[in-house]
């Protein structure tokens, strides 16, 4: 039996660093909600059985009319952290017929620069892998170590072998669910899915990502994202 593909978009964050009262995933960029670009990229990939958006139970900003015509489902099962939201979403995927052997691609709602081409590159690279992996970029900048709360450089860190994690992150549903559960039992709240997979003793792979697939986090990021989204994505 061929494994199916599901997408999971954790969308329960408040965007506290973005400088806006409106959660960043609902801010308008180039005429559309930021979340719209993420959903449109996955909607363009007919390979997916379902795309599930996880929002907070008390989300008062989500308006399905802003995403009319796109294929996705929504569940109000967001948790107190990304890890909790992803875990709850994985459980909800069973409602759509997902099994432990199926693949899930978890993607940040705040990465609107994702493209169908990059999604398909990740799938093509990992569909036969025993573990799965992520899109990422080799670190290009020089890294400085500074003590917490300070501003004095302690040392320069080698960037050799360092990659900056992006999303989507692609793993088997059962493996990822078990890995997150193990991390939770061990008292760890990890910031991405690959960290949970690593914590469980597995070795994810990296697939070359894209600079346009950056995470919108700070106020100045919105102008950059809008400029990128106004331009057609290059095929890759």
UniProtKB/Swiss-Prot annotation:
It is an enzyme of class 2 (transferase). Transmembrane segments: none annotated. The record marks 17, 24 as: Transition state stabilizer. SUPFAM superfamilies: Nucleotide-diphospho-sugar transferases. Pathway: Isoprenoid biosynthesis; isopentenyl diphosphate biosynthesis via DXP pathway; isopentenyl diphosphate from 1-deoxy-D-xylulose 5-phosphate: step 2/6. GO terms for molecular function: 2-C-methyl-D-erythritol 4-phosphate cytidylyltransferase activity. The record marks 159, 215 as: Positions MEP for the nucleophilic attack. Catalyzes the formation of 4-diphosphocytidyl-2-C-methyl-D-erythritol from CTP and 2-C-methyl-D-erythritol 4-phosphate (MEP). This is 2-C-methyl-D-erythritol 4-phosphate cytidylyltransferase. It comes from Burkholderia mallei (strain ATCC 23344). The gene is ispD.
């Amino acid at each position: 039996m061929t494994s199916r593909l599901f997408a999971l978009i954790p969308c329960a964050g408040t965007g506290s660093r973005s400088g806006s009262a409106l959660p960043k995933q609902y801010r308008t960029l180039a005429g559309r909600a930021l979340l719209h670009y993420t959903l449109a990229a996955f909607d363009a990939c007919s390979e997916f059985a379902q795309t599930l958006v996880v929002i907070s139970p008390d989300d008062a900003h989500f308006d399905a009319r802003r995403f009319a015509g796109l294929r996705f489902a929504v569940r109000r099962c967001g948790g107190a952290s990304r890890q909790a939201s992803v875990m709850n979403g994985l459980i909800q995927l069973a409602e759509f017929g997902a099994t432990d052997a199926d693949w899930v691609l978890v993607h940040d709602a705040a990465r609107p620069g994702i493209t169908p081409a990059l999604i398909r590159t990740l799938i093509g690279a990992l569909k036969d892998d025993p573990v799965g992996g992520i899109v990422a970029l080799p670190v290009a900048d020089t890294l400085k170590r500074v003590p917490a709360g300070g501003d004095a450089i302690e040392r320069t860190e080698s960037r050799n072998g360092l990659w900056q994690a992006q999303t989507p992150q692609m793993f088997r549903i059962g493996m990822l669910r078990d890995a997150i559960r193990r991390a939770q039992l061990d008292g760890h709240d990890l910031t991405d899915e690959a960290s949970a997979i690593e914590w469980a003793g597995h070795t994810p792979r990296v697939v070359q990502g894209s600079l346009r697939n950056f995470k919108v986090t700070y106020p100045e990021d919105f102008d950059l994202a809008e400029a990128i989204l106004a331009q057609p994505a290059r095929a890759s």
